[in-house]
Amino acid sequence: MAKHQFQTEANQILNLMIHSLYSNKEIFIRELVSNASDALDKLNMLVLTNDEYKGVNFSPRIDIIADKEAKTLTIKDSGIGMNEEDLMNNLGTIAKSGTKAFLENLSGDQKKDSHLIGQFGVGFYASFMVAHKVEVTTKKAATEQAYLWISKGDGEFEIEKTTRESHGTTIVMHLNDDESEFLDSYRIEGIIKKYSNHIPFAIFMDKDKFIPAKKDEDGKEIEPSRNEVENIQINRANALWTISKNEISDEEYKDFYSSIAHSSEEPLAWMHNKAEGAIEYTTLFYIPSKAPMDMYRVDYQTGIKLYINRVFITDDEKELMPTYLRFLRGVIDSKDLPLNVSREILQSNAVMAKIKNASVKKVLSELAKMAKRDAKKYDDFFTQFGNVLKEGLYSDYGNRENILELLKFNTINSDEKIMIEEFIKNVDETKKEIYYITGKTSLSMLKSSPALERFKSRGINVLVLNEEIDTIIFPMVTEYKEYKLIHVNDVKFEENENDKKAQEKSSKEFEGLTKELKESLGDSVKSVEVTFDLVDSPVKLKEDKEDPAFMMAQIMKQMGQSGDTPAPAPILQINPKHELIIKLKNSADINLINDAAHLLLDQAKLFDGVQLEDTAGFVLRLNRVIAKAI
């Protein structure tokens, strides 16, 4: 038996891999099954294309054998196998992969058809995370000699000649004492279903089967119950997403959703797409019928599983799809995705970026089709996921217009939500302006906002956005196509000379009252001024967007830290035509003016969805004013 040293500083690399490279030990099974799948793929390719292998029997199969007494776990395949040179090159050199070298020798259609997974040569060594000794018996197809490779993961390995009936590879792992969980058939089956359920070859394993006792007609036991060992297939060996969608029934789609989403509820919809060209990939995305419980948590669990040639790579990579589509469940599978050395963390690469960008556009396109074809289903979707979708207006500038077209809006002219394309049908084409109002309050309260009175009086429709996210997102959305989006507080209507003169006159007449109100309110307001935008309400609040404090508050809000920054004092605007304001102007009762000032400010705050800090004071003032009025 010849002893050899691992190349490329093996001790250091083995130690790193065993203790640091993988975050969970169970994936050693994934790696070895992936290697077995590669070996079967290679042989299949050679049998089909190479005369030297024409007579080789190709009966693809992977077996997993757990021996609890011997404390060994065996993974066996009927693939291409290895000769001594292959063992030296592929198992003697870390970070060199026979599969990768094999890929380099392929071209054209052969490369497309080779479902080769192991692009890096470290997966095999993951076995040393759980085993103190690994034995590999292998025989290359179309050769006579078999070889035994043995290592304890200590920097050395041995190779000797041996015998083996058929081509293929058998890996026997002598497990560490604390790794007995990997001898449990149910644990192994769970790992296979999680990581390797969809590789193209069947995986078999012995499982205990309980045979109940047989009884005669009188109930007397004639044959005792017993356990029998049954060799069964434990993976599907057929990736649903690789099948033409015309050949998949709705029930099959729903069953697959249940298995990947771990949900008993049916999905709301699904999208199955196969892309061919410079980059080949397949996606199968589902929209759940209900929002995931953790959808608004920072540590939400992504629902997209990444496969490379049907082998599960990760379901914990949030960069696979943008966060505003985090409600999606499903798979991305590609032959063209390069992965880093551990296969657990995706490289930042152009291929993944292209797959992601194209997938996002496809999802948005499918949602747009749903909105047109099935309004009820889309309403259900938007009820569950509309607010999450809005996040894309901020985070995905390139798709902002498409996302806007998917949103549904409340308006002051309708009780039904409408899409933006429907809304702009009634927009003044000479101005091309879309007006909106935001506020963290109820829809009915926001629709009654004093800030909308001048629009209602002119018959102008306005988008009413009463979700908290709207106050953060929409100030950053300034246009849609050729239309400008403008907050109602920033709209200035044209006025004739007579109106301007009348307003100047009123402003001077109410200078005394504005001064008294400001003195009563102090720093609660930045200033008090007359406005001619109001019709039925006595007052409203206005933000001073030139105020540095306002600008800082907006920046902190966009950063998600609005709670750390005090809101800048607003401007209180009064309606000079309102009976209450006129009476206050003519009143000499300082106490009444003081109480009214605070009540009017609180009233304006309530309309804007601001909680009152001094509810008791509000009630006391209200009672005093009512008492004087009776």
Swiss-Prot record:
Q: Which Pfam families match?
A: HATPase_c_3 (PF13589), HSP90 (PF00183)
Q: Per its record, what are the GO molecular function terms?
A: ATP binding; ATP hydrolysis activity; ATP-dependent protein folding chaperone; unfolded protein binding
Annotated region C: where? 555-630
Query: Looking at the record's lineage, which domain of life comes first?
Result: Bacteria
Q: Region A: start and end of each range?
A: 1-343
Q: Name one GO cellular component term.
A: cytoplasm
Its main localization is: cytoplasm
Nucleotide-binding: present as a keyword of the record? yes
UniProt-listed InterPro entries:
HATPase_C_sf (IPR036890), HSP90_C (IPR037196), Hsp90_fam (IPR001404), Hsp90_N (IPR020575), Ribosomal_Su5_D2-typ_SF (IPR020568)
Map out region (B) in residue numbers: 344-554
Spell out the subcellular localization from the entry: Cytoplasm
Q: Which UniProt keywords apply?
A: ATP-binding, Chaperone, Cytoplasm, Nucleotide-binding, Stress response
Protein's UniProt keywords contain Chaperone: yes
What NCBIfam families does the annotation carry? Answer: PRK05218.1 (NF003555)
Q: What is the recorded function of this protein according to its Swiss-Prot or TrEMBL entry?
A: Molecular chaperone. Has ATPase activity.
Subunit structure, as described in the record = Homodimer.
PANTHER family membership = HEAT SHOCK PROTEIN 90 FAMILY MEMBER
Q: Which family does it belong to?
A: Belongs to the heat shock protein 90 family.
**What is the protein's name according to its record?**
Chaperone protein HtpG
Species for this entry: Sulfurimonas denitrificans (strain ATCC 33889 / DSM 1251) (Thiomicrospira denitrificans (strain ATCC 33889 / DSM 1251))
**Lineage of the species this protein comes from:** Bacteria, Pseudomonadati, Campylobacterota, Epsilonproteobacteria, Campylobacterales
